[in-house]
Structures are given as C-alpha cells and as structure tokens.
Amino acid sequence: MAIDPNSIGAVTEPMLFEWTDRDTLLYAIGVGAGTGDLAFTTENSHGIDQQVLPTYAVICCPAFGAAAKVGTFNPAALLHGSQGIRLHAPLPAAGKLSVVTEVADIQDKGEGKNAIVVLRGRGCDPESGSLVAETLTTLVLRGQGGFGGARGERPAAPEFPDRHPDARIDMPTREDQALIYRLSGDRNPLHSDPWFATQLAGFPKPILHGLCTYGVAGRALVAELGGGVAANITSIAARFTKPVFPGETLSTVIWRTEPGRAVFRTEVAGSDGAEARVVLDDGAVEYVAG
C-alpha cells in the first residue's frame, strides 16, 4: 500500500505524555542554554523560578504519531519540512498532556516528485481537558508522489520588511550539541554516528537536529521579543532549509512587523567570505507585546 490520500482527517487515540523538571532542564541544555540562562537550566537557583522554553512543545506534544495513518512510504525519503507550535498556556516545568494527532493534509506533487504530509498535534490537560499546546509538522517525502492525491498549495510565506532587521541574536552551538539534544528523544544516528552520516546520508559528518536549530532560534526569540520570559512567546513557525553542523554559530535575524508579531530567519555565517547560509526561513512568531 502506498500513501493513502483518503487518510486526511485520520486521528490517533489520545496518548499521555508526562515529563519532569529534569526533562525540561535537559532540553534547555540540549538547545544551547547554559550558565547565563539559569531560569531554563536550573530549578533551585536563589530568586529564580524555572521556566520552560516554548519550543519544548515539540517534545511533549509531538504530531508524528499520525504518520502511521498515511499509508506506507520509504522512511529514508523523509525530510522535516517545517515546524510550528502554538501555546495556549505556559508549559510547566513538570507536567503531563493528553495528545491527539491528526493527518491535517496530504499533497501529491506528481509521479517521481515529492509528497507533502502535514500532521497536527493537540495537547490537553488530562484533568481539565483545556487545550495547552498545538504543533504543526510538515514532512517532505522525496520522490514519493504519484499516488493519486490532490496537488495542493504551499502556504503563503510571511512577508519580510525591506529594511534592516530590528535585531540579530548570535548563539553558538557546541561540537557535542547533537549528543546532548538526542537525549530528549531523537536518537537518529544521522546526528551522532559518523559512519551513518557519511556512508548512508552523504554528509561530511553528523548534522544537528533540525528541531535543535529550531530550539536555539526559540531561545533567541524569547530573549529578544519575550524579554526573557518564555510565557510571552505564544507561537513560532519556520521552514527548514539547510543543515547545520554542531559547533556552528546560529544568527537569528528578527523584524518586528506589528504589535505582537514578528518575522525571522536563522542563518550560519559563511566561511572565507561566502554568503551566510539560511537554515530556517519564513519564520513567524507571535508574542505578548510589552
């Protein structure tokens, strides 16, 4: 069985995701937070309450469960195309969510071309039933088109102002950043095993998880737009465009567009005078304006 275009709207049974403060602390370190970010990396510092980065929603409210509903495809053809989160309440340092995932859309770009699968996750408080977090994950299945689905349309990209950005936030990553991030759940050897990365994937060395890059950008947005308060960031969406290698410095470039809204890109500086490499594009963020 190939990809089933009739699986749009299919949902999974609720799954309970539970986490501790250790998990949220480890995640923060996994996306590069450190001694200058004690609100995210410690739970017992004097006068500092622990906060949880908004991008932790990709861990505690994952949308990937619904991928099992779309039929069969070659997993080696899968790329993570884009990621969005929306928070309706701040994520607690330790907690639990009842998560239901759904096949939101499937697009068939034609025989021998790509298939696009959009998955949605909704995480609710298991006691009150109130919606806490939503995630939207786009998967690109290379060469898996031609299964009789609708071609569909790519969502409109946000418009970027034709002016200098309002902020540029540089955040370095560690050489072992992927080894830390993988402890939050994604053990794909592409990010840790040099043999796998070079011999099977064609990279010169293991690459950083796309969602780690997304989390580093989230830290920059919390710092610049949220004033260091995680709860002030309510939505982040971006498209993955290029790989990142551990040890590279990520620069998140931000334009405020209207009260409570901004657009952003994240890039890696080019070497030997080359142009910067955009690794996250079409970024859009909503926040509580001060």
Curated annotation (Swiss-Prot):
GO terms for molecular function: 17-beta-hydroxysteroid dehydrogenase (NAD+) activity; 3-hydroxyacyl-CoA dehydrogenase activity; enoyl-CoA hydratase activity. Pfam families: MaoC_dehydratas, MFE-2_hydrat-2_N. It is an enzyme of class 4 (lyase). Keywords: Fatty acid metabolism, Lipid metabolism, Lyase. GO terms for biological process: fatty acid beta-oxidation. Residues 161-271 form the MaoC-like domain. Its EC number is 4.2.1.-, 4.2.1.119. Residues 147-169 are annotated as: Disordered. The keyword Hydrolase does not apply. Belongs to the enoyl-CoA hydratase/isomerase family. This is 3-hydroxyacyl-thioester dehydratase Y.
